Amino acid sequence: VILLGGRTGRDGIGGATGSSKSHNKKSLTTMASEVQKGNAPEERKIQRLFRDGSVTRLIKRCNDFGAGGVSVAIGELADGLEIDLDAVRKKYDGLDGTELAISESQERMAVVVAPEDADKFIAAAEKENLEAYRVAVVTESPRMVMHWKGQTIADLSRAFLNTNGAVKHARVSVGEKDRSAFGVEPFKTLREMASSLKCASRRGLTERFDGSIGAGSVLMPFGGKYQATPAQTMAALLPVLPGQETDQASVMAWGCDPDALSADPYTGAHDAVVLSVAKLVAAGADYKKAYLTLQEFFEKLRSEPQRWGKPFSALLGALDAQLELKAAAIGGKDSMSGSFLDKDVPPTLISFAIAPIKAREVITPEFKEAGHPVYVFIGNGTAAGQKAAWEDFYALHKAGKVRAAWAVENSLAEAVMKMSFGNHIGFRSVDRKIDWHRRGEGEIIAELTEEPLFVYGAKLGKTTSEPVITLGDDSAPIDELLSLNEGVLEEVYPTRAGSSETVQAISWEGRSPVVCKHKVARPKAVIPAFPGTNCEYDTAKACIRAGIDPEIVVVRNLTNDFLSQSAQALEKAIREAQMVVLPGGFSGGDEPEGSAKFICSFLRNPALSDAIMDLLKHRDGLMLGICNGFQALVKLGLVPYGEIRVMDDSCPTLTYNQIGRHQSRYVTTRVASVQSPWMLKCNVGDLYTIPISHGEGRFVAPSKAAADLIAHGQVGTQYVDLEGRPSMDILVNPNGSLEAIEGIFSPDGRVFGKMGHLERRGPFVAVNIPGEKHMPLFESGAEYFK
């Protein structure tokens, strides 16, 4: 048995045993050690290792370290085990045997391999900069035995462990339904609804998370021309390695209404399941292929039958919905510790639904075109009727007649409003008698290409070119509703910062005079993967599509020997390549105090610096840095100076976004200069819609340095609005960069650094955002060498 990944500390001790504790005012200081500390770069290294089929085929059984730590993750692997706790590597000294056995430190895996494969597996892990070592052995004796410091501290029979402990009993009483819970009242107007917390936009929260990583997001969290219609599902391509393509995707959605669950846990949970599946249907999936997983969170139950009645009712409601839909829940999580002093959480059951789908069949929710009929698909109040309505909708979708769809969540009015936001396409109702503010469990609103012959439902109205929503006697402009909707949580999750002034559009028409004298039919690109890098696969895919052979070199820093070997391997690769591409990510976790410090320190190694300068100055090579890679190029001096040098206060740099948080969305960039081999296939004024994802992307420079860049044609790209005008508006310029600068060249154009992730593209990527997403940068680089 091999332990793989992170080291073990006191973080997480008590995580499982204390998962149902009630906290108090002292918990923050007395129970902090029970909280696990995540390490995303370490987890990603494990992902890289497990994508190697030759490695995973060595594994007979494996387990992730979760609740219970070693005692569970390893203890579950086989009936008989001898576990050596002294072998478990620690974050620090002082842990006793029990702490080593139950710590829930994160980013650890336990794997079982054949004895003859152990060294091979460990060597493969070390190639990915991971620690891996033997900690236990499988035995014939059906006992779990733990040793620590020469003592046997646990010796338990498997028969005893398999009993799962003593039988437990609880008394349950299902109370009266509390229809007044939270004082839920229907909204009276569109403006009131748009201003409510219930329907508020979560964009300021969502943009803190990378929505485009992996170049596999079929849907971005917000879509449409204005990126304002929220996606109800997460749709993603199955991950494949560079050189492979797929159109197979999965869609996942959730359902939960705390108000409904508080009023009636049974009905609330039932509706949560129905809503989660309805969202899949609205995205184009077949509900018959859906599976579920449930998460529950309830107040501390104590020994009170009334409290026990809430999860009892909720689980019964969820089970009934599963039986009606023939959709099974596989796995899940629960916690019964939602009480703090005299406060209790509302009964919470979240249903997550997932289904397979072809990426080209995914329906996006934003209205597409004016003049289209809009229908609501309604059952007859029974499960059979609901499924019939879904099947009717699905048939129209397969016939190509559905342009947009939304599963009704809070009200019909909310659905129409949010479908209108993305492209500012208006809506006008046809019937004044419709109750627009009622909820409709399982109902789906759809924009159709034509009037259907027959549907399980009713016509609601038509889309309009005028950006106004009219529901009977209630009417409001879309931009006003959107402003109200995004303003609800502005103080908590801000979306606005800086000014909205316009800046100059930079244009440098002159082409680069640089000529490649060392021609090759298929250039080679070296892609270093530093600790924290997360875009090397996407970058390699972009290279392959452009006719470039990528070589990913993993930089290992676990030991001094690994670091030295990595430097030698990278130097060798650079001297054999035609280009170096520094991919995006968060090298070293962007610590301490700023991004790309580890990359810069590593590349300042004299041998590596010499190899890079030889590539650029003597072998006609090229260099590209994207996002984290751009940060490294700037801090090394490769842009804008074209050489590795010591930087000072007179030099440009990249710093924290003006809004003070991570930004993830799509932006429009304009080609400002083509004075680089990287721009051979681009023209000044070309507009591209590409994703950004960074916390430190704000380009700043002293006024003289900025003026010199502009005067010498070194500003390659600018952030612009939909009409191609550079601006300081945060919706245009997401980080507040000086002169809306997105990318810059070295003086000869051989080195290009930019923030936007142009490599994150594909025919099924971000289908809910319009625009030209293919910037032929890699193709230009390949053309330069031919």
Predicted regions and their residues:
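Cysteine-nucleophile active-site neighborhood
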Residues: 583, 587-675, 779
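Catalytic metal-binding/acid-base residues of hydrolase active sites
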Residues: 66, 335, 587, 629-631, ...
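Short, basic, glycine/proline-bearing loop/turn elements
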Residues: 33, 303, 592-600, 717-718, ...
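Short acidic/polar capping segments at secondary-structure boundaries
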Residues: 7-9, 116-117, 140, 381, ...
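Glycine/proline-enriched, intrinsically flexible loops and inter-domain linkers
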Residues: 1-588, 602-613, 744-745, 773, ...
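Short glycine-/acidic-enriched loop or helix-start segments at secondary-structure transitions
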Residues: 12-13, 121, 341, 537, ...
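General alpha-helical segment detector with a strong preference for membrane-spanning helices
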Residues: 68, 288, 411, 631-632, ...
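Amide-donor transfer/coupling interface in amidating biosynthetic enzymes
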Residues: 563-565, 569-570, 611-614, 646-786
